[in-house]
Amino acid sequence: MTTIGKYGPSEPPWPASAGRLELIAVVLVPRVKITVPSLPSGFVARAELCASLDAGAGAEVALVCAPAGYGKTLLLADWSRTSTGVDTAWVGVDRDDNDPRRLWAAVVAAIAGCPSVPQSSRLHGRWAWRPGAQPEFFAELAEALQALPRPLGLILDDVHELVDPVALHGVQILTRIKPATLQLVLSSRFDPPLSLPRLRLQGRLRELRAAQLAFTPAQAAQLLEQSGLRLSPQQVEVLHRRTGGWVAGLRLAARAVEQSADREAFLTHFSGDDRSVADYLVGEILSGLPEAAREFLRVISICDLVPIGLAVALLEREEAGSVLDRLERETSLVVATGRARQAYQVQELLRTHLLADLQRRGPRRPAELHAVAARWWAACTAWPPSGGPANTSRCQPSSTPRTAMTMPW
């Protein structure tokens, strides 16, 4: 355990005229919280992404953002071990860090534990935290960081766990004080509520998202082979297409294929409704969403690619486009396509799970939705818009979920 002092609440138990602070408690930081996670056997290194993080050191803030199961934590753990340009300090963020005293105790302890931090550094001292004295705390932290002899990458993993306004404001301050020695690296399942547009405009933000984290067919083949599974190139291509390169989906598929008596039949029917995949999707992704958001996703799951106008018709909500945009920003479960951002896609395994869930609730609703989609496409004369995606969209008929019904673009 590493300890760091904390001071009183915003209403201190001493007279304001006393002009002093009193130590009232100590925060214990578990060593595992500030230790870089180990890499599992069969780990597929992503040298190109590590190089991108190295190249982004001058950007000051790096954001690795994708839904659960895309390998964010393992990528950053690998980068932390292999980067030669910066030392790294690791903090695994969890819900308890919505107590800002715990969060910043862990941050200071992680930084102080870096070998390049000299023993004379202020970072090895006792630190005080008071909600009413955040500017002073961060000014002192910035000064201590500025004095470091080498650049430092501070990794806050799973920053989506932070919802407390004070804790988030502290991270926001850290993006503003800009000590020259610090690169702040955030991993999250969705965009954290920080000033990301401002950072982009200033050229201070480097981003890695699901599209970059998704495995290529070659990386998928390497992962499957290292899992002890030898498949033909055609079988690998099928799994890669079904999973979209989603790492967790590939791992779950590999385990299921090993246990299957008929590999070809499994690969033919593998979808997001496979039990192991469905359990992961529900437990790690969908359970954290409100029912209204889950229902929205179920409805749009009838099509591979959903233009905003079709979403409006399916949901009977004029603001469906705004909801899609919000889902993209806050969950990363849908992705806008094309320069015009006029259509959205749901990750394939998640979409097939949602479609099966919709069908289990009765045949009437899927049939009604397909009828709405058919009428919308029949009336659509100006698709794709300029700059929009040019390939076709397919809506799955509820009676034959694996048979495509091609709609005009």
Language model segments and positions:
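Alpha-helical sensor/transducer elements of the RecA-like P-loop NTPase core
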Residues: 22-36, 45-49, 74-76, 105, ...
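Short, amphipathic alpha-helical segments that act as regulatory/interfacial helices
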Residues: 61, 104, 108, 112, ...
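Extended alpha-helical scaffolding segments used for macromolecular assembly and cargo binding
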Residues: 364-409
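Conserved phosphate-binding/catalytic loops and adjacent sensor/switch elements of nucleotide-binding enzymes
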Residues: 68-70, 74-151, 161-163, 215
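C-terminal boundary/linker of central alpha/beta nucleotide-binding cores
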Residues: 19, 63, 67-70, 74-81, ...
